[in-house]
Amino acid sequence: MASSGSCHSLLSSASPISPALFSRHRAAAVGGGASRASKVQSQVRCLARDEDSKGCANVSKAETNEEKETTPSSRRRCLVCLGAVTLISATGPPNGLAADAMNKAGVQKAVCRNCNGSGAVICDMCGGTGKWKALNRKRAKDVYEFTECPNCYGRGKLVCPVCLGTGLPNNKGLLRRPEAKQLLDKMYNGKILPRS
């Protein structure tokens, strides 16, 4: 057989786990009973063979002991490297001071939390439909009819009261200006439209 690698189950007298441990009589004789049987594990090793090799029979004890010492450390290193690569690829490259100084394209802008930077919010009175259910009392019966929303004037959206339509999270300087009173009056009377 010419194969580059194969997996073999090693259950011989030379291996640390012998078939004698699998017998019920042996476990009962030791006194462990079921607890001893639960500690039994099978051992499977992968051995790479060249075309010249004659199989598992020629593997000496010294070579297997060498493999036992080197294989777990190399597997641990591989697992650590694999975990580190996965973590780095999931989180992305770190944003340091140099990245901030070079370009700010990767950094998101701070936006208003109320409107998410759009400058407009959905009217809370009509739910964004622009229609409002009004009660019409004519004669003996009451009738509900849909009219224009008195809060948003039928538009369904209002100017954000937190950022005043700018979309920015901090506009305290805007409110200190003398023309801010006129701006607020227009906004509350519905004369300022969202996105205008």
From Swiss-Prot:
Molecular function via GO: protein-disulfide reductase [NAD(P)H] activity; zinc ion binding
Entry's localization field: Plastid, Chloroplast thylakoid lumen
Chief site of localization: plastid
Disruption phenotype: Slight pale green leaf phenotype.
SUPFAM superfamilies referenced in this protein's UniProt entry, alphabetically: DnaJ/Hsp40 cysteine-rich domain (SSF57938)
Residue stretches of each CXXCXGXG motif repeat: 112-119, 123-130, 149-156, 160-167
GO biological-process terms attached to the record: photosystem I assembly
UniProt keyword annotations, A-Z: Chloroplast, Metal-binding, Plastid, Repeat, Thylakoid, Transit peptide, Zinc, Zinc-finger
GO cellular component term, pick one: thylakoid lumen
Span of chain positions assigned to the transit peptide in the UniProt entry: 1-36
Highest taxon of the lineage: Eukaryota
Zinc finger feature spans (CR-type): 96-172
Function: Nuclear genome-encoded factor required for the accumulation of photosystem I (PSI) during plant development. May form a complex with PSAG and mediate thiol transactions in the thylakoid lumen that are important for the assembly of PSI. Possesses protein-disulfide reductase activity in vitro.
Protein name: Protein PHOTOSYSTEM I ASSEMBLY 2, chloroplastic
